[in-house]
C-alpha cells in the first residue's frame, strides 16, 4: 500500500503546486467491463497518487505535524522555539460537531402508519450499526482533506450476537479509496486498495453490475455486484473537494510563526548577551562572578576609555504582536465561517443580537449551505440500504418517502419552538408535520409515534367532527307547477 513517510517540513502549496482541492478522476469510456477495467484503473491511479500525497499531508497537519516544527534559525539557533497553535484540529472538530453532534435521522414524508413504523425501524437499525460513529469519521475526513467515503458491505455476522441487518457501514480511508466518474458526473467505478496476508497490494473495484479483483496489473477475479449500485459512496466537502484546512493553511502557518517568534523574543530578552566595553574578563572569572550575581571590572586604558559592562536587550513589542495575531485570527474565523467565542457581550443583548454579532448566525448559514451536498451522498447510501432491506425485510419504503434530517442544537429558543408548535396545532396543521417543522427533537418520527394517541385525542381533525353538508338537488319550479 502507499506509504508516505515524509514529514510536513514544506508548506502545503509546494506539495499541491498551488492546485488546491482534490482532483476528480474521470474516464472517457462509456461502460466499464472486464475488458477495460485494468487500463482504466492504471490511468486513475496516476491521478490518485497525487491526491493521496495531499491527503496524507493534510491529515498529518490536522494531527499537529506542521512546518513550524522543522524551522531552522541562522541567528542564535539555540533560541528556536517551535510552537504549534493547532487551529486545524479545532477547525475540523467544530465543523464536524456542527453536523454530527446529534445523529442524522430519517423522517417520513407523509402520514402512512405502516411506513412510519418502517422509518422507526430503519433508524433503530442505523443505530445498531453505529452509523453515527461512521458519520463522525466521514465528516472529519471531509473537513480534513475535502472528501470522504462510505462503504456498505455484506455483514456475515462476524461473531456478533443478534445482528439485525445483513449489511455493515464503514468509513473508508480516502488515501486508499477513490471513485472514478463518467463525464456526466455519474460514478463509473470505485477502487479500494488493500493488502493480502503477504503484504502484496491488490485493488477491489465495483461497478453498478460487477466487482473486480486486480493485482500486479492483471484481472484475477470478477463477479456480479448484487447491490445494483456501487457500494462505495463519496462524500465531498464541496464541489471542488477543497478541505477546510487548506482554505486557511497560510494563515495558520503564519500564526504558528508569530507565536514562536513571540516566545523567542521573551527568551532572548531573559537570556540577553553581556557587553564588555574597554575591559577584558577571562571565562572562568566571568562564570564565577555571574554565579555571585555581580561583575567587577576595571579600565585598562586609563580614564579616557572607561570600562563598562552592559546587558544587550531589545525586547519584541508584544502589543504590536498581539494586534497582528488578533487580525490573523479574525481573518481565520471570517473565512471559515466560525463564531467568535471571545466577543464581549453586554447585559442588554438579546439572544438574536448575540448570534448576529458573534457570528453564530453566519456559522449556521455556512452549515446550511453545506447540507445539500451531504444529503446528496446520503441519498445515494439510503437507496442501497433500502434496496437491501426490501429484499431481506420486506420494506415498502422508497427513497422518495425518506427525508434526511440533520440535527443541530435543540436547546436554542425552546420557548419559541414550543409556542410555534402550539400555534401550528391550533391552526389545524397535522401533528406529525408540526413536530418536524419546529426542529425541537432529534428523532421527530419517534416522538410522533409516541405522541400519536394523545395528539389525536387533543387535535382531532375538525373535518371529521363536522357533518357532511346536505346537497339539495335544484328543482325546476315551472315543471312542478305544470
Spell out what each predicted region is:
Residues 383-398, 429-446:
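Long amphipathic alpha-helical coiled-coil segments
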Residues 112-115, 299-416, 453:
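Surface-exposed loop-to-helix/strand elements on domain peripheries
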Residues 438-469:
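Long, highly charged low-complexity segments enriched in Glu/Asp and Lys/Arg with interspersed Ser/Thr
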